[in-house]
Amino acid sequence: MLVLASASPRRREILSRFIRDFHVVPSNAEERCSGTPEECAVELARLKAREVYSRVGGTVIGADTVVSIDGRVLGKPSDEGEAYRMLKLLSGRVHRVTTGYCIIHEGKEIAGSATTEVKFRELDDELIWAYIRTGEPMDKAGAYGIQGKAGLFVEWIRGDYYNVVGFPMEIIWKLRELGFEVLSR
């Protein structure tokens, strides 16, 4: 039994493109950590995977995505003002999106991370506030979702697009190495 330890509809949708049979069991783990963005993402993924594994067993995938700029981690905005400040900070600059993952398979943990660089165009206040009014940024690390309207903001990316969405292809490859069938319908 393959279990995705996430409430994210984006992670569920990406995984379903490659693997047909899996269950979704959101984690109840508390999301707090310290360290580098990479360490933080992996640690949060581990906490999620372990918490769900303790309840349901099977093969469990935990993932957590963080956006960072100047070494500072940008989580999900708590309100519109914080979303504005995050987007203003990202405007015209390169930032990093890191997804940590932890797969617990037969009691063993396989953990790692993927990082993608993203460059935003210069964003004026009118555009930032129009985007915030869509409601899209409020449940996303760094206050944006590349797969939605904020795709307009992106000048370029270097790395895995799916990582920026929250589920890097590295996870699919790890699952394949563990014997899970991918691309079957």
From Swiss-Prot:
The lineage of its organism: Archaea, Methanobacteriati, Methanobacteriota, Thermococci, Thermococcales. One of its GO terms (cellular component) is cytoplasm. This is dTTP/UTP pyrophosphatase. Belongs to the Maf family. YhdE subfamily. It catalyses: dTTP + H2O = dTMP + diphosphate + H(+); UTP + H2O = UMP + diphosphate + H(+). InterPro entries: ITPase-like_fam, Maf-like. GO terms for biological process: nucleotide metabolic process. The active site is at D64 (proton acceptor). CDD domains: Maf (cd00555). It comes from the Archaea. GO terms for molecular function: dTTP diphosphatase activity; UTP diphosphatase activity. Nucleoside triphosphate pyrophosphatase that hydrolyzes dTTP and UTP. May have a dual role in cell division arrest and in preventing the incorporation of modified nucleotides into cellular nucleic acids. PANTHER family: BIFUNCTIONAL DTTP/UTP PYROPHOSPHATASE/METHYLTRANSFERASE PROTEIN-RELATED (PTHR43213), BIFUNCTIONAL DTTP_UTP PYROPHOSPHATASE_METHYLTRANSFERASE PROTEIN-RELATED (PTHR43213:SF5). Gene3D superfamilies: 3.90.950.10. The record marks R10, T65, Q147 as: Important for substrate specificity. Keywords: Cytoplasm, Hydrolase, Nucleotide metabolism. Its cofactor is a divalent metal cation.
